[in-house]
Amino acid sequence: MTLVTIKKDTQIAAIHAGIKIGSIYESEKEKGISHFIEHMLFKGTKYRDNETLNRELENLGGEYNAYTDSNSTVCSITVLEEELEKSIEILGDMFQNCLFPQEEIEREREVILSEIRGSKDDLEDYSFKKVNETAFDKSPLKYDTLGNEKIVKSFTRDKFIKFYERYYVPNNCFISIVSDFPHNYVVSIVEKYFKDWLWKEFKREKVLEEKNRFLKKVSYKNNVEQSTVVYLFTLHGLSKKEELALTILSHRLGESGNSVLFRELREKRGFAYDVYTDLDLSPYVKTLYIYTSVGRENVDETLDVINNCIESIKKGSIGFDSNTINLMKKILKTAIAFTLEDVTDIGNYAFHQIIDEENIFQFYEDMKDLDGIKEEDIYNVANKVLNKPTIHILLNQ
């Protein structure tokens, strides 16, 4: 088990406990199983039935949550510091003693099937799924974390138990805890409730890193008021410095109300309410998206605007002078400072750093390295990354 504790002057304790297993490690016949098991963690253990478990979580008086992403399944609890030990004990029970009652499996299967169907009604979410499906041939990024209806319907209790017993082992568990308690005290509590968990060898599926396809695809959907346009770029193999430069570029391109795309598509032309970039630098993911939603009559001009903005940045026509770069640095440093102030945010940050085998003090390095980013670094990474996108356009049927 990997445990990191962060001592902070606070009355709140934030615990993030997770298993390094998510959608990118699932085989084709397992798509959605990590997410399904995340749901089942709350459905009863050897020592607590569903009702008891959820009542005790509620009685902690704080907030609890769970999520599954590309490479992890995570449970988080934020409570008053006096509830730290009880929270750790409950999480220990969930991670070691989940029972998968058949009646709860069937009930939760319907919930997840409803979640999958409902996601198709979310135009934004649906558009991202379609561009991922279009962009990749074999990469796990083409599959949704929820899975699909056919596979979710096929999962058996035996399959859940085998997957749970294979990956829910201490040597695949990562925990971050933020509180006012000293490190040794927190370690003693974790050891108390996880000491009997048996170490076991396991092997994750090898993850394929794949460059996106260079193509444009148009899909159609019934009862759609707006059309969506999504660009996807993959960015494997960048250095840390290039990733920092790309972070500044992404912010300037589409992450603020003064970004290039926002001003061109919304302020100047009134085409879109939503327009933004989304940068994901997670291991094995490494993607940059551009998303907007416009009227069908404006799709062609929107494509021209996005393409022109990209080319203008690559050619240096859209400048990154010292004032612009310094502002971007200030914004990124402010975001880091906000994270450090919030116990839940810093706990989540530390959790993902350790699960990705990164330095938990990387933000200090990033803040220092930001000062070394120059205009040419941004243009260089723009010319390296902003080429041959996958473009998906969704129109009304």
What are these regions (language model features)?
Residues V4-G18, E201-V260, L394:
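His/Glu-based metal-binding/catalytic segments typifying zinc-dependent metallopeptidases
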Residues M1:
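Short, Gly/Pro- and small/polar-rich lid/capping loops
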Residues K7-L57, V131, Y231, K241-L253, ...:
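Active/ligand-binding-proximal structured segments within catalytic/core domains
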